Regions:
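Terminal, regulation- and interaction-focused segments at domain boundaries
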Residues: 2-41
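A generic structural signal for well-ordered coil/turn residues at beta-strand boundaries
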Residues: 14-16, 65, 91, 103
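Short amphipathic alpha-helical/adjacent loop interface patches that line ligand
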Residues: 31, 73, 132-135
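Residues at alpha-helix termini
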Residues: 40, 57-58, 141
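Compact, glycine-rich, soluble single-domain proteins
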Residues: 44-96
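Beta-strand/loop substructures that line and gate deep hydrophobic ligand-binding cavities in soluble
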Residues: 96-120
């Protein structure tokens, strides 16, 4: 990662994803906005993991709000599964909504192009490009 040592974590994306910082709002509002923006690009939410609640329940650790949304675009997922049946090991696309240490609300998107590089299937690579374009539009709609 090319992050300067003093750069806030919420401002530099990892190589396996990309993100945006939301305008000020409460966490529940952010989840609604993210879900609606994903829906506008054809994604539904298959799973929602409340990491904050899980860490509290399992480890007794208090942490900031943090949700992992398992987003899926069924037609694109079907194409990928048809091209490579075991690609389900890399699905769905995770989208993280979290509160950063500086109080920013950050939305992180798994980069399907980076993740799907594990396969050498050109059809899967093309689908990953399409998924990334949709997720980038979601990011633009949220910023």
């Amino acid at each position: 990662m090319n992050r300067p040592p003093d750069a806030p974590r919420s401002q530099v994306p990892p190589s396996y994803g990309f993100h945006c910082v939301l305008p000020p709002q409460d966490f529940a509002q952010a989840l609604v906005r993210v879900t609606a923006a994903l829906k506008a690009e054809g994604f539904g939410i298959l799973t929602e993991i409340d990491v904050q609640a899980t860490m509290k329940a399992k480890l007794g650790i208090d942490g900031p709000p943090y949700r992992i949304l398992g987003a899926c675009n069924p037609p694109l997922a079907h194409r990928a599964l048809t091209a490579e049946p075991d690609i389900g090991l890399l699905l769905p696309c995770n989208v993280v909504v979290r509160e950063a240490a500086d109080g920013d609300l950050v939305v992180g998107f798994m980069d399907p192009v980076a993740v799907m590089q594990m396969t050498s299937n050109p059809e899967v690579a093309a689908i990953a490009q399409e998924v990334r374009a949709r997720l980038e539009r979601v990011r633009s709609a949220l910023a």
